[in-house]
Amino acid sequence: MDQDIKTIIQYPVGATEFDIPFDYLSRKFVRVSLVSDDNRRLLSNITEYRYVSKTRVKLLVATGGFDRVEIRRFTSASERIVDFSDGSVLRAADLNVSQLQSAHIAEEARDVSLMSMLQDDAGNLDAKGRRIVNLSDPVADSDAATKGYVDEGLEHTLRFSESTVQPLPPLSLMDGKILAFSGGKPIGILPESGSAADVLVELSKVSGYNLIGKATSFANMRSASGLKVGDVVLLTSYYEGGTTGGGEFLVKAGSAVDDGGHICVPSGSTNIYLERITSEVHLLDYGILTELNGTGARIDMSGKLQSAINRAKSAVMPLVTGIPSENHYIRRGVYIEKGVDITGIKTITGCLSLLVDTRKLVGLVAPGYPDTKWALVNLNAQFNASGIVFGSTIGNQSFDSIVVRDVSDRGAPGAGQLHVTSGTMVKGALCATGFDGPGVSILGSYDSVIPDIRSVHCGNVAQWGVDIAAYRGSRPDNTNCMTIGRIECHDATDRALRCAADLSHVGEIHIEATLVTSTEQSTSATIADNGWGYANVLLQGLGTSYGSVRDLPVTGSVPPVVEVVADDTVVDSLSLPRSNLSLHYAFTTPRGCLSAGTINVGGDIIVTNGANTNIDSITMGGDSAKLTSASINLNVGILRAVGAASSVVSVGGNIGRLECASATLTGVDVLRGSITSLTLLDRNTISRTTAQSLNVVGTRNYLKSGFRVSGPATLGGVNNSASDTVFAGAVALKDPWKFIAVYINGNVTYSGNTTSSTYDVSFQDVFIEGELLLSGPCRIHADNMRAINMRIGQMQTGFIVMKNCTLSGGVEGNYIGSFNVPPIGSITQNFETGIPSVFTTSGWKPLTLA
């Protein structure tokens, strides 16, 4: 022990009592420990040791596992022995104790420093013969290394008993040679040709792979002999001289069917077979070739492709195509002449791109659709003679993209791809091009996500280019709970798209260049009753929402019809610059509703009876565009028909703002508007609207605050009224009306209604900037009326009651003789005197006007 250390001392075990060689201020500053090279135990006073005297302690525990007893002083730097306070007596003894505590702390710190690894006079760290423990493995070349690190490194070296060994020759002299020793010196020698050493040297070269025995093609592997269970066979390439489709095969016991890709059965073998060692099924494993745009040799790969698909299904492996994902502009694909069935497959990685020629294609038939031949089917459900078994759809599939193209471009009737699946995720797109029939059909499917669906040159008068709907069956199972990002139908013929999925969402629909050749497509009541008898786009689905919808047909084509079914359906926007629109009722009880944002239509709109609609705005851009509504619940925020010959015919609902050339309304509330020619039948309420001409022929029509007619008005019907309105032209009254707070800048003519038992006309707070011309049966009630002249002609029956009225001109009319007793209140003018008279119970009395 270094004698310069004063506060730490260690004794060998063996005794029980040990001296304390240093002074201390308190026993709690003395620590007694049992120590060894790799362990230390701090003992407790009284229970594990005790003081024999002030300078001696006695151990009370065994020392097994330890070889030393350590006694050290550890004076507290925070717990003061002497605590000074203001006003206390300062004694020398207290000062000495306080100074001594500080001295002890400094002395102990010096001893700890002396126990640490210090620099010697040369600047090197001196461990003073002690071990350095808990050292990490070295990283840099100059780092210290542990014994374990060094020992492990030596275990991987070639060791000799001699103290020194000469270095190996340069690597340039050792290439292709094996190591040998001559005279104690390492040398390189060439192995004997054909020897095991020679083989090992050759195999160790970069080119050694070429020396390993292997099958040169899948067909060559079938002729292998001498194989035993457990052997591994290396296949260079699927085809002789090729570079793809190779791999390793394990020889297994048993019988199997050779599938031409993953299972190989040697010729004549019945008890062994070779199975490819892999965790996926690649198209190249089966020698499946692709072609560019279908212009190559067109080798039919349908058999190989179906084998690969079947292997992926049975082994539950992903099918890897190795074809980059493409949309409908397909360039490279696998040519097939027979339809393929991917039912039950779980994963397709890469784009499954198929090229077909419908003139040669032997398509697959799906249950319930005997006349449609499909290039690809995916039928994850149970079926019977009628079609699908309700509620049986499964799936849980994952696809990158599936693209099918008819290289003959509608060369013969055919169909692209049909999916019946549930819980499926498509990462890319489902696309079809060039089919005279369905392109992409998703029927009886649920709970799936598809970012993109596209068809080009698909559809006909009987089948939809894209069809998302129910699968046929005794109880049709409708598609529902689908999330579809985008649907695009380009260059469709007649039927472009039907989307009838329930409780689903479609983010965007883009229809372009549709060619409509027929208007005879009414194969269902949904279409037959839509007002047009045909539809090229059909959007429906209980509780389904659509984002933006756009349809732009071929110029010169028969105007296509876009039909939207009010089945609690939501559409953000409809842009149909050259299309007609049908807003149709749903065959549900109670009737559903359509909620739409903005609708822009270049053609006409028909709203069928029972179609409950709530629409933010409708704009009709055609010169003679016409909206015809048979629904009593057509509710529109803004309805604008901008054409000079545009018209609106509606039987009910609410319109926030109506702008059109001509409107014929029944049961409609219009809050504001601008109309050239307005005809009101029954039960209309019009306010804050300007009409250039007005014709009222029905009953219970109410012209309210802010209504204005800038031209002539013909007012017929009964139980009609006008209040707080302006007639800027002449008014022809055909039937009794009630006017309150009305300004008429023209003559008012009332001819009376000889067929009506009630023929009252009421003027209250009315200003007629013209003449009031009365003829025929009438009963006039005027209160606070102003007019220029009142002319009465051939009034055979009736009366006139006037109160607070002003005639700036005068009253003139036929003379009523005593032999012609009129009803009480009748009024006339004595042409001889010019004094107007009114008939009372006392006879004719002069009439005084205020």
Swiss-Prot record:
GO CC entries: virus tail
Domain of life, per lineage: Viruses
Pfam families for the chain: Phage_T7_tail
Record key words, sorted: Degradation of host capsule during virus entry, Degradation of host cell envelope components during virus entry, Host-virus interaction, Viral attachment to host adhesion receptor, Viral attachment to host cell, Viral tail protein, Virion, Virus entry into host cell
One BP term from GO: adhesion receptor-mediated virion attachment to host cell
Compartments, as annotated in UniProt: Virion
InterPro entries per the UniProt record, alphabetical: Phage_T7_tail_fibre-like_N (IPR005604)
UniProt keyword Kinase, yes or no: no
Broad class of where this protein is predominantly found: virion
Function: Functions as a receptor binding protein (RBP) and probably mediates the attachment to the host capsular exopolysaccharides. Displays a depolymerase activity that specifically degrades the KN4-type polysaccharides of Klebsiella pneumoniae capsule, which allows the phage to reach the host cell membrane and bind the entry receptor.
Family from the record: In the N-terminal section; belongs to the Teseptimavirus fiber family.
Domain notes: The N-terminus anchors the RBP to the virion. The central part and C-terminus probably binds and degrades the host exopolysaccharides.
Self-association state and partner proteins as the record states: Homotrimer.
Name used for this protein in its record: Depolymerase, capsule KN4-specific
Organism: Klebsiella phage KN4-1
